[in-house]
Amino acid sequence: MNKITLPIGMHDKLFKRARVTYEIERDISDFLMAQGFNRIDTPTLEHFEVFSDYVEPHHYHLFDKKGELLVLRPDVTSQIGRVIASTRVHTPTKFSYSGKVFHYQEELRGLANELSQAGIEIIGYPARKAVLEAIKTAKQSLDLAQVKSYQFEFSHAAILQTILESLALDSQEEAQLLDYIRKKNRTGLFEFTQTRSSEFDDFLQELPYLFGPSQQVLARARELVDNERILTALDDIEQVLQSLSGLLDQTTMDLGQVAAMPYYTGLTFKVFGDRVPDAFLSGGRYDQLFKRFGAAELTAIGWSLDIDSVYQAIHDDLPDEGGKEGDGR
């Protein structure tokens, strides 16, 4: 019966889960505002062009009564880009936010389609200062949420962008290549280089193995490529990691990390923990996003944290109170 069942990917939260996820969102939001971030709330419904020039299959679309195509927001960063371009907000500025975002996932994947997020955007500040502040506040937010074990993994969007631009693939070929990279399919990548040979052949064939301790990955990557733009991206990662040496005990890299959002242009990072299969925090630089809305390029970096995944990471350490077994914990 549709009266008592939920749409695909939607979930009720009860008792401890509802209380703790609320507390995580509240505490991180209060912390970020205390650190000088300006709170911003954006609408759940937007014109679909804010997020894409074409209809995306993983977005929730609907028509309003005037026939305008709208979308349930899949992320907040694009909305903030719209705000910067369409209002008189002065930069540099720093925003923090929390709220729901929506991604349509196939039913059999068992993933949530409604996600609770908290995040930040640092816009118009010197790049290196902004990167360090973003990563520092990400770490502090995870510590505040009492996540005991986690690790930062770094990459750089310019690496894959350089390869894709150089190869000039059609949309189907590009999607296939990214699928090979995302799945670390070495056979697929080898076969691809046999049909679309380029200066990146050695790098692409080895890409599924270019992950692990940062210095080892950097050293190996530099042996495989001599493209100036990619080498500059590797230098950028290394310089950031050197600046973070007193903040993060250990870092890893994955140069086959495919950015979750298309607007990333520079350093990207994800955070993984022991009890969560996917990254529960991700972010990066997106200096060119504002051009999409007719504004000038600005240095910008941000991150978003999946509150429900953080709850999953700390669940076993929480006191067993409020509610009974099987009641939505």
Swiss-Prot record:
It comes from the Bacteria. SUPFAM superfamilies: Class II aaRS and biotin synthetases. InterPro entries: aa-tRNA-synth_II/BPL/LPL, HisRS-like_core, HisRS/HisZ, HisZ. Keywords: Amino-acid biosynthesis, Cytoplasm, Histidine biosynthesis. One of its GO terms (biological process) is histidyl-tRNA aminoacylation. It is found in: Cytoplasm. Gene3D superfamilies: Bira Bifunctional Protein, Domain 2 (3.30.930.10). GO terms for cellular component: cytoplasm. The keyword Cell membrane does not apply. The keyword Amino-acid biosynthesis applies. One of its GO terms (molecular function) is histidine-tRNA ligase activity. Belongs to the class-II aminoacyl-tRNA synthetase family. HisZ subfamily. This function is generally fulfilled by the C-terminal part of HisG, which is missing in some bacteria such as this one. Heteromultimer composed of HisG and HisZ subunits. This is ATP phosphoribosyltransferase regulatory subunit.
